[in-house]
Amino acid sequence: MIARKRKSNGSETTSGKIPKDDVSSESCLDQPADESVHEVVTFEPSTLPSVHYDPDTTEPISCSLKSLDELLSWKRNEASIFNVSSVPLASRYPPLESCPRRTLVSHDMMGGYLEDRFIQGAEVETPYAFYHWEYIDIFNYFSHQMVTIPPAVWTNAAHRHGVLSIGTFITEWTDGAKTCEAFLADEESYRAAADKLVQISHCNGFDGWLINIENELSETAVNNTGPFLRYLTDQMHERVPGSVVIWYDSVLKDGKLLWQNELNDNNRMFFDACDGFFTNYNWTEQSLEGMKSYAAAQGRFADIYVGVDVFARGKVIGGKYETNKALELIRKYDLSTAIFAPDWVYECHEKADFRQNQDKFWSLLSDFLYIHRPSSNLPFVSSFCQGFGKSLYWRGKVETERSWFNLHAQEIQPLYLSESFGNGGWLRTRGCSEDAWIGGSSLMLEGMIPSGLSDVCARIFSLHVPLAARTFVSFVFKPPVGVKVSLELKTIDGPLCTFDGTEEIASRSVFPEALAESNQLVEQFAQNCGQWASDGWATRCFLLKMIGCSLREVCIRVSRDGGDEDINFNCRIGEIMLLDADNLQAPLQSVEGICVNDVVWQTGVLKGDGHTLKVLLNATLRWQYPTRQVRHFRIHWRHLRGPDPRIPSGPLTLIGRSYSALYRVVELEVPAAPGLIELVVEPVSKEGFSVPEAQWGRQTLSYSQSPSGNPSH
């Protein structure tokens, strides 16, 4: 994940689990791994498909499909092996089907496929990222290309938080009308198009489609639109359980293009054929009243997503920093909402103030949004990384010193809240990239404890995690001056864990006491981690003994350390981790089956001697390893032997990080041919425990000059 800087030119060009039924000729995981791979260095142009690999660097990229021909000719064995979600959809409370008022976010930003198209990350000073996942149910990646396939970085981030990720199928203008006349001509045609949409969603690991037909339809086409939607919806449900198909308010039952800004008799046929209806943005309170009393909507209010354009284009209610006014009205009528283009906080403001503006925007909406609880078994781990930063950290040390952006790296996000108390007291949590424990950011907890108040408490996680009989807790932070910091955990008993999540349940607070550093569990944990503290970071460990309980909230309590005057504080939180205390040494598997393919050799700029060109290696590494056991993989390389036998073997050097069992080595400078290098894959466990080198994966690559002796061309 060591990123390269890319221009935001808006060009489109499709991250990565490998489907079980993938029979692509690129796959070599089922073949015996050679002890060494040999390559002949030839500087020929790359033959990799430019829609999936950057033509200049061969970096893997995400892309859309621009035409009906591209859709109908799509084949699984020609699809990108990188643009595939590697994170399964997490459970959460309340489940989507139980949530009476849902929130969809439609991400429409400057045409789409910007820095986020680089699947292994990009070097970006001030990127846009979404991290208020606790508030939303569905994430839609939107562009004006015909078939918008969500970049896997977004799907992974959404899935990690239990949020659905859906793509967009859109037709517009004259060309769109021609497309519709073709694929809606008859049953065979619309089924062929729907089948491809289902296959693409299944292959890439996302969860459905927004269907947006913004052109007029002939009588034949509109009569086939309902059956098309119904067939697509049924097939999606069968192939991708939990998926959704949502219709955008556009054409009417007679084929005319006339936005209604509500669900009514003119567009009901489309609503009846799929999972939801996304209204246009120019609605009024009268529109909401009408939908609330509309017979066809009864029992399906949650499936009506009232559109809100954050840019406030046209005659709309709310928008911008008054979007909360629109949500207040929508929730008054018990309807769901679709928030369109919340990247307004990024596009229309100073990029350096992005975090502050995004937190302000979602804070204003928070009274009208559910907080969803991601649900998982132990271990639960978060370092608060938002998927970007000024440097890349590992255990408080800078691993890569440059700006980067990669949503694959985003971890479970905390609640970003702001509260005020009497006498001027306040409390806020925010992400901060100035320092981090792991990843690119830490959680800043800051505020003022006013005179007369002994402490303040910040809720940083709402979740649902069944605890072990003995649960080990690790808490990494930088101790602040003048105040004391402690953990408060809220739990519920096991019998209460079967509810559907829509009602509040009384919890009890647990205030664990820190274990001594001499405690056997603490010593074992420290030994597994390989490093105890760094650059002012402190680690506190706790042991919970609770049978049949689940964790519901993680809170941090800040109390004054003597005195009664107003006291300002700021505390940096690096990581919170909960583990089964009886499995602190769970054995990890070895990386197996490393293979190297799709090798491309390039020449770089002249070296310092003025006449020798740099030799650059580009190659895809694939291996076998259960990715659910790891936080990420570190990819290393070292020089073993070159043309000059007097030069000894080199040390291992980090190339980057991978978040799946797949990595593209890009522009790696290696010694001139003939040479021998070693490529190494190091698994990093979710807990951050050190993995013995004997379990790392290794593959040697030898290379020689072409027989002509001229490696240039």
From Swiss-Prot:
Q: Top enzyme class of this protein?
A: hydrolase
Output the InterPro entries linked to this UniProt entry: ENGase, Glyco_hydro_85
Which is a Pfam family this sequence falls into?
Glyco_hydro_85
GO-annotated biological processes = N-glycan processing
Where in or outside the cell it occurs: the entry states: Cytoplasm, Cytosol
GO: which molecular function terms?
mannosyl-glycoprotein endo-beta-N-acetylglucosaminidase activity
Keywords, in A-Z order: Cytoplasm, Glycosidase, Hydrolase
Which terms in the GO cellular component ontology are assigned? Answer: cytosol
EC code: 3.2.1.96
**What chemistry does it catalyse, as a reaction equation?**
an N(4)-(oligosaccharide-(1->3)-[oligosaccharide-(1->6)]-beta-D-Man-(1->4)-beta-D-GlcNAc-(1->4)-alpha-D-GlcNAc)-L-asparaginyl-[protein] + H2O = an oligosaccharide-(1->3)-[oligosaccharide-(1->6)]-beta-D-Man-(1->4)-D-GlcNAc + N(4)-(N-acetyl-beta-D-glucosaminyl)-L-asparaginyl-[protein]
Residue span, BRCT domain: 270-362
Where is the region Disordered?
1-36
What family does the database annotate?
Belongs to the glycosyl hydrolase 85 family.
Role played: Endoglycosidase that releases N-glycans from glycoproteins by cleaving the beta-1,4-glycosidic bond in the N,N'-diacetylchitobiose core. Involved in the processing of free oligosaccharides in the cytosol.
- The name this protein goes by in its record: Cytosolic endo-beta-N-acetylglucosaminidase
- Species, as recorded: Danio rerio (Zebrafish)
Question: What broad taxonomic lineage does this protein's source fall under?
Answer: Eukaryota, Metazoa, Chordata, Craniata, Vertebrata
